[in-house]
Each structure stands twice: as structure tokens, then as C-alpha cells.
Amino acid sequence: MGFRLPGIRKASNAVDAPKGYLAVYVGEKMKRFVIPVSYMNQPSFQDLLTQAEEEFGYDHPMGGLTIPCSEEVFQRITCCLN
């Protein structure tokens, strides 16, 4: 049994994200998620961005936006944004 997060698109091996989406890397394994750009305006997601800024500044090791939280926390937060 699984659950579906319609706002999160399945990450592919492609470097580019579709128009209106942004690739982020999450968790210890740096799993790639492709999320709607509209999430950037949500207060709960902005909290994650603040954490990312505090931990990484503007130097993100994966070349894209790295979110310093577990995959479970990220999915729980983004699930509420859908």
C-alpha cells in the first residue's frame, strides 16, 4: 500500500525540470524531487529554505537546491501543500 503526492512529480534522471517545477535534493541520500515552483511562496516551505540557507548558504553540493531534512519530513510538509 502506498500513497500519492500529486504535487510532487516523479524525479527522472533528466537534468532539467519541467516548466513551472524545480528540482530539489533531500535527505542523507540526496533524493531528487521535482516540485511546483508555487511551493516557494508557502510559509512551511520557506522554513525549509531558511534551513537550507543556514546550512549551505548559496553553495549547494548537488548543484541544485539542497533541503537539509529527512525525506519523510519533506514529504509530510509537501503533502500538506497539495
Swiss-Prot record:
The keyword Ribonucleoprotein does not apply. Induction: By auxin. GO terms for biological process: auxin-activated signaling pathway. Keywords: Auxin signaling pathway. Pfam families: Auxin_inducible (PF02519). Transmembrane segments: none annotated. It comes from the Eukaryota. The keyword Ubl conjugation does not apply. Signal peptide: none annotated. Belongs to the ARG7 family. This is Auxin-induced protein X15. It comes from Glycine max (Soybean).
